[in-house]
Each structure stands twice: as C-alpha cells, then as structure tokens.
Amino acid sequence: GLKDIFKAGLGSLVKNIAAHVAN
C-alpha cells in the first residue's frame, strides 16, 4: 500500500544520505 511505498522511498533516501556521509 501507500505506507509500503513511503517506507521504501524513505529507506532509499536514508541509504543515499548514509552513502554521502560515508564518503
């Protein structure tokens, strides 16, 4: 549902931020 899409998007965003911080 919509919550799943939101969770997936949020998880992707967190991963991207974590990748930038790691670099």
UniProtKB/Swiss-Prot annotation:
Keyword Glycosyltransferase: no
Protein's UniProt keywords contain Membrane: yes
UniProt GO cellular component terms: extracellular region; membrane; other organism cell membrane
Annotated positions of the Asparagine amide modification: 23
Tissue expression as described in the entry: Expressed by the skin glands.
Sorted UniProt keywords: Amidation, Amphibian defense peptide, Antibiotic, Antimicrobial, Immunity, Innate immunity, Membrane, Secreted, Target cell membrane, Target membrane
Chain segments annotated as transmembrane: none
BP GO annotations: defense response to bacterium; innate immune response
Major location (coarse): secreted
Coiled-coil regions listed: none
Locations listed in the record: Secreted; Target cell membrane
Family per record: Belongs to the frog skin active peptide (FSAP) family. Alyteserin-1 subfamily.
Function: Antibacterial peptide with amphipathic alpha-helical structure. Shows selective growth inhibitory activity against the Gram-negative bacteria E.coli (MIC=25 uM) Has a weak hemolytic activity against human erythrocytes (LC(50)>100 uM). Is very weakly active against S.aureus (MIC=200 uM).
Name of the molecule in the record: Alyteserin-1d
